Amino acid sequence: MSARPVAPEEVIERIIETRMIAILRGFTPEEAVRAGRALADGGARVLEVSLVDPRASRSIERLREELGAGCVVGAGTVITESGAEAALEAGADFLFSPGLNQRVIATAEARGALAIPGVLTASEVTSALALGARLMKLFPAEPLGPAYLKQMLGPFPDLRLVPTGGVGTGNAPAYLSAGAVAVGAGTSVANPAWAHEGRYELFEQAAADFLRSLGDTKGAT
């Protein structure tokens, strides 16, 4: 496909506006399209397809084709340069990684796409900033919690963090209140079991419920 990705600043704006990245993992391309459409109907219009899935590239292609400009579609679990290249060739608008890989960031930059590296420590944040990262994934978030994120923003007050891993309706508002710009949500909004059972209405309901749980809580900008 190799479609031109949405400009990085626009992707960042869409993520901040939506306050949530819905993570699709364990779906066939057909399931991903139906789930993605339902999630978008529920208000979750920033989607990520995990490269752990063997047909992730096809899922990204299909989502871009079917959902059009109404959604931003990225690739997740991007840990290698080859994975980054395959995802961008499939049409990914952004790369969401669990860790910090200079080659992944460089590959995204060369293609005009946004790379969101994963960080956990101040040293990793410093390295990511030096590489030009404008948005970072705090992973894994659950073992550390919102208080850790808030402490991380002390020396980095302009840092844009997206906590991911164990984030659901019970703790997402706290992360935003602590200073996150958005959160990454997996099975709490995109459970592959629902697709296997053909219950796609649950995706729309879960997305709407998740966003409703955030209330008026705004992430940092």
Question: PLM features: what roles do these ranges have?
Answer:
Residues R45-V49, L88-A90, A110-R111, T121-L149, ...:
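Glycine/Thr-rich beta-alpha phosphate-binding loop at enzyme active sites
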Residues R25-F27, D53, A75-E81, S97-N101, ...:
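Glycine-rich beta-to-alpha transition loops that act as phosphate-gripper elements at the mouths
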Residues A40-R45, L67-G70, E89-L95, A110-I116, ...:
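Glycine-enriched alpha-helix->loop->beta-strand junction motifs that scaffold or abut catalytic
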Residues A35, V104, A108, E124:
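Aromatic/hydrophobic pocket-lining residues that form π-stacking "cages" and hydrophobic walls in ligand
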Residues M1-G91, A110, D158, T169-G170, ...:
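Conserved N-terminal beta1-alpha1 strand-loop-helix module at the mouth
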Residues F94-T107, L138-P146, A172, A178-E201:
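Glycine-rich phosphate-binding active-site loops on the catalytic face of alpha/beta enzymes
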Residues T80-A90, S123-L131, V167-V183:
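Catalytic cores of alpha/beta
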Residues E61, K150-Q151:
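Active-site phosphate/pyrophosphate- and oxyanion-stabilizing loops and adjacent acidic/basic residues
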